[in-house]
């Protein structure tokens, strides 16, 4: 599988993931790009699960973002509805983490759209390791969100055999006005 982690701290939202693609117990590729920008660069999305399935979901999600003019929550809810009700989509085995300046969400194939309670959220085989590390670093260090994502993904890669150290990290800087509204 893989590990995708997002951290929201200060004026940063960061999503990162490793690059390992496995087929069973065999590493097929080590530098896949599982985190990418969508909707004019305003949204960052990362996937864990089947690569082909994830690309299908990226396309569908980007379509929903266009339909809802970049409104992340509406697009996520509509994707989750489609994913749950469409026979072909229901068979897709992947999960998405999506984030913009206002929200961070996880979207699952069972129709769940969840916003994290804490500043970190992770999916994939190494997700629990990465999220635990990130939460500890958020609470106990002055590291930036990007530094936390990098360190946490490396910890997950040290523990999880389906996660490697080839990282893709994307970040969004939150405007001061938006940051004030969220407090």
Swiss-Prot record:
CDD domains per record: protease_HslV
Keywords carried by this UniProt record: Allosteric enzyme, Cytoplasm, Hydrolase, Metal-binding, Protease, Sodium, Threonine protease
Cellular component terms per the entry's GO annotation: HslUV protease complex; proteasome core complex
GO BP of this protein: proteolysis involved in protein catabolic process
Active site: 2
Pfam families: Proteasome
Activity control, per UniProt: Allosterically activated by HslU binding.
Subcellular location field: Cytoplasm
InterPro entries linked: ATP-dep_Prtase_HsIV_su, Ntn_hydrolases_N, Proteasome_sua/b, Proteasome_suB-type
EC main group: hydrolase
Superkingdom in the source lineage: Bacteria
Annotated catalysed reactions: ATP-dependent cleavage of peptide bonds with broad specificity
Residues where Na(+) binds: 157, 160, 163
GO MF annotation, one: threonine-type endopeptidase activity
Biological role stated in the UniProt entry: Protease subunit of a proteasome-like degradation complex believed to be a general protein degrading machinery.
HAMAP family, per the entry: HslV
Subunit architecture: A double ring-shaped homohexamer of HslV is capped on each side by a ring-shaped HslU homohexamer. The assembly of the HslU/HslV complex is dependent on binding of ATP.
Stated name of the protein: ATP-dependent protease subunit HslV
Species in which this protein is naturally found: Marinomonas sp. (strain MWYL1)
Upper classification of the organism: Bacteria, Pseudomonadati, Pseudomonadota, Gammaproteobacteria, Oceanospirillales
